[in-house]
Amino acid sequence: MNYYYMAMRGSLVVGLNTDLDHHLADEVRQVIDEVVEERGIRSIIFDFSKVTFMDSSGIGLIMGRYKKMHQNGRIAIVAPCRSVERILQISGLHKLVTVFESMGEALDSCEIHDDNIAAEKGGKRSVKY
């Protein structure tokens, strides 16, 4: 399997087990959009620890999910390699997403972010996974 996904602590974790190119980006995009819609996910965390290459379709995947999530959620990327981190810098995505060294840090940060948004809107989030 080239990727996995799971709902975890209010976030959708998407782990990629190979490089992110146009072949994989379209499939992952469809899965993410479906799960976010069905479960009311507010944050998406991409685990890039096994990704060594990302082309423009990977940038498009991240940018598209950012556009859908940025008002009520966030996008995080975990453990990108130097070449992928450079692509994030060159494309400007580093200004839109948060990069973390570990999954634990990303989950903690997204959970706090979700709780803060819920508090701003007058209540705690009550989405169950």
Predicted ranges, named:
Residues 101-129:
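A charged, well-structured terminal subsegment
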Residues 22-97:
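Amphipathic alpha-helical interaction surfaces in cytosolic regulatory modules
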Residues 10, 82, 104:
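Residues that form or immediately flank small-molecule/cofactor binding pockets and catalytic motifs
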Residues 2-30, 48:
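STAS-typified acidic loop motif
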Residues 21, 47, 119-123:
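Poly-acidic low-complexity segments
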